[in-house]
Regions:
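A generic structural signal for alpha->beta connector loops
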Residues: 96, 131-132, 156
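Conserved strand-turn element in the central/C-terminal portion of the radical SAM core barrel
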Residues: 74, 106-109, 135, 171-176
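P-loop/Walker A phosphate-binding loop and immediately adjacent motor/lid segment at beta-alpha junctions
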Residues: 88-91, 100, 145-176
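Structural recognition of alpha->loop->beta junctions
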Residues: 53, 60, 114-144
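Conserved Radical SAM active-site core
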Residues: 1-3, 17, 35-115
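Flexible, glycine-rich phosphate/dinucleotide-binding loops
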Residues: 12, 108, 168
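Short, flexible, glycine/charge-rich loop motifs used to bind or transfer phosphoryl groups or to couple energy/partner
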Residues: 10, 57-58, 90, 123-126, ...
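N-terminal pre-triad scaffold of radical SAM enzymes
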Residues: 2-29
Length: 176
């Protein structure tokens, strides 16, 4: 997997001060995407163990609230297979930090609850979802763009609290 950039002090992609990883590779190709260069799976630099360690080190300070994944598309199967073991390391090394993930896929598609879904599902999808606290789901829709929304770009996108959703068996929206 490649990545395009790491932001070590981000306040736009989740609550508090965050470390943000922009992965490369996306098949959604949303009109108006703010990172179209990340559609290419080969764009950027190789995500390797040294990058993992750099991110873990960046997450250590107390003022960092958590990690955010976006891109590109973190839930493209080839990206999941790299991100899942990394997220396990994040949970082990930084158990008090939260993890947010932006995806153009809907929660129902990722969980397999939508009939005919499965394009993004692979052998690690469920386990990867279990490591994420908040999923911002849905493609960016230019016609629904709203710059006043908190932590999302278009009206159709949802901030889903995955922990509470799992507990209650239905989608529970995040509310800080």
């Amino acid at each position: 997997m490649n990545y395009s950039v790491i932001k070590k002090c981000d306040i736009a992609d989740g609550p508090g001060v965050r470390v943000t990883l922009f992965v490369s590779g996306c098949t959604h190709h949303c009109m108006g995407c703010f990172q179209p260069e990340t559609w290419n799976f080969s764009f950027g630099k190789l995500f390797d163990e040294s990058v993992e360690q750099e991110l873990l080190d960046c997450l250590n300070p107390d003022y960092i609230r958590g990690l955010t994944l976006l891109g590109g598309e973190p839930f493209e199967p080839e990206n999941q297979r790299v991100l899942f073991p990394f997220l396990k390391k994040v949970r082990e090394a930084c158990p008090k930090k939260d993890i947010w993930c932006y995806s153009g896929y809907l929660w129902d598609e990722l969980t397999g609850k939508e009939t005919g879904s499965g394009r993004a599902r692979c052998e690690v999808t469920d386990e990867m979802l279990s490591l994420i606290d908040v999923l911002v789901d849905g493609e960016f829709v230019l016609e629904q763009k709203n710059i006043s929304l908190k932590f999302r770009g278009s009206e159709n996108q949802r901030l889903i609290d995955l922990r509470k959703s799992e507990e209650q068996g239905e989608i529970v929206l995040w509310d800080e």
